[in-house]
Amino acid sequence: MVQPLRRGVRPLTWTRVLPRQTRQPASSHRRAQARYVQIRATPTDQPATVNGSNVPIVDTPSSAESADARFEVIGAPYSLLSVTLSASQNLYTRRGTLVGLSGKADNVISTLSVLEPFRRAPVGVPFLYQKISSASPVTALISTRSPVTSFAVVHLNGSVDWMVAQRRALLAWTGRSLSIRPTINTSLSVAHWGSSEVTGRGLLALVGSGQLYSVELKEGEKYIVHPSNVVAYTVSSKPPRPYRFKSTSLKLQVPGLKSLPTFLQNTQFIKAMSETDSWKTAMRIFHTVRTWSRMTIWGDRLFLQFDGPSTILLQSRGARMSDVLSTQEVNEFASTPRGLTIVPTKQEEKQKGSEQDGKDDVHKAPGTRSVDEIEQEIKGVTQSIAVLTKEGKVVFQKPGQQ
């Protein structure tokens, strides 16, 4: 019995595992091949350097307070808005964003308000808001349905007006003298299409995609930013202007009849073809393809230039180009040369017009005197005496001559 057991039993082999410190050669070889990458968050209280100028890019304030209300952004990353209202103070918030409310619920009155639908609907600005008022102080929580949004609060003291650039950035506001007017694009300006001008005194709550940051520009400073990342900015005497970067571009030209010679344009065949439905449909398709290519392929060149002093609220995740710019604006920017597209003011136009009129008057003014008259004026006035001779001839003599 013992022999079979001994045959089936094998000695156990073991290996001693040395600590990492004792394996100096292998450890040093592995350490030489390793690459250490250290990632640290950039402090937001330090100004960022842009083209040699210190342009501070900081986080938006988390709270704002007035005499009758207080807005405070809570949560990480900024997912809730806490609103503290005093008695008889009105709060306007977007429909479906109220999460909860603390206080005497019997004193709270909630009504659905329709704010200027005929002015807001054409530009895509929401016009259904919930009006909340209470006879006693209450605290409300407000949120949005999107999981990638953050809040920013703005305190308006009446000295500086704000322009909300994004159509759905306005979430809530309060203030008895606060006025919000939607602006309609009438002059193809990117700064006022689908925007809302905010004036007066009160508190404003804005929402953006991703994280919101504030850019402070001083006098003489300039900043170029993509329009889809601009949430709001202060209204100043220097509105933002469109800017295009230099890059290689493929020009798409829509075939037109004006490019043909003049004798071909006047033919009956060309005139009849331009009036057909097939030609108009083809032109419409060509224009649509050109606009789509400008929005998708060359859309990164369309920017806005802000001049200080100004405050800009930016969102880290930009919206679609079609949500910010209209097709007419895209075609207008793409057709302009690179650089800053400056729109002349009325005063400059009047000054140029008066100068041009003066030049035209100088060129068109008829001469009042001939060359002979001018030469005669330079030489002076001379006097001659006509003398009739015996032969019947008339001879002109100067005075004193015999």
Curated annotation (Swiss-Prot):
Region (Disordered): 344-372
Keywords on record: Mitochondrion, Transit peptide
Transit peptide feature range: 1-36
Pfam families membership: AIM24
Compositionally biased residues, Basic and acidic residues: 346-372
Subcellular location: Mitochondrion
GO BP terms: inner mitochondrial membrane organization
Keyword Transit peptide: yes
Gene Ontology, cellular component aspect: mitochondrial inner membrane
UniProt keyword Transport present: no
Chief subcellular location: mitochondrion
Entry similarity comment: Belongs to the AIM24 family.
Record's protein name: Altered inheritance of mitochondria protein 24, mitochondrial
Source species of the chain: Emericella nidulans (strain FGSC A4 / ATCC 38163 / CBS 112.46 / NRRL 194 / M139)
Gene: aim24
